[in-house]
Amino acid sequence: MGECHPWVQGSTLRDATWMQCMHFADNAGWPVTFHVTEPVGHDYPGRVSTPFDDFLWLAREIPTLKIILAHAGGLFPFYELNPKVRPDLQNVFYDLAACPLLYDPQVYRQLIDVVGYEKIIWGTDYPLRVMPKTQEKPDFASFKNLLHNEAKLSSKEASAIFGGNILSILP
């Protein structure tokens, strides 16, 4: 379910309507994807902050809910380096949609090193041209090749990130 963004609608994850949706998704075994913005960095029209505290709260409130944080989680994954927080994030995953527009390419290997390749899901935001300097038209191959080459993915990592991980969390 998603890409959800309650904050753009003036809401929060703690609102009863959103919690009802989260419990529904959890009971159905569906993962929920959230739009995530990094706390500092890019500014663009329509940007609305996505408070990291809300994601941590949700992961603790419904620990069985599979949560996918888009755009490498807005760098939320680095909270997993905190030993008091990491156990609460077992069901939090990170997609890579639009990452070439947001981060330097070394972010992919760093992300793998921090959270493990098992928690990373390849996403594209297609038909967005995520590599506008080299793409005339949107495509999947450019980003996939960038990720594979920059992160120096093993065949096991590539298989998981490019499909296995999402399949493992779908009902």
Predicted regions and their residues:
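Residue-level detector of flexible, active-site-proximal loop/helix-junction positions
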Residues: V8, G74-F76, P100, P127, ...
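Mid-to-C-terminal alpha-helical segments outside catalytic/metal-binding sites
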Residues: V114-I121, V130-P171
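Short, surface-exposed alpha-helical recognition segments that flank or form part
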Residues: Q9, G46, C99, Q135, ...
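Catalytic pocket-lining loop regions of alpha/beta-barrel enzymes
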Residues: R14-W122
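Divalent metal-coordination and catalytic microenvironments
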Residues: M1, A25, H71, Y94, ...
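Mid-domain alpha/beta scaffold segments of enzyme catalytic cores
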Residues: M1-Q20, F24-A28, S142, H148, ...
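A short, flexible beta-alpha/helix-coil linker loop
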Residues: P6-V8, T37-G41, P127-R129
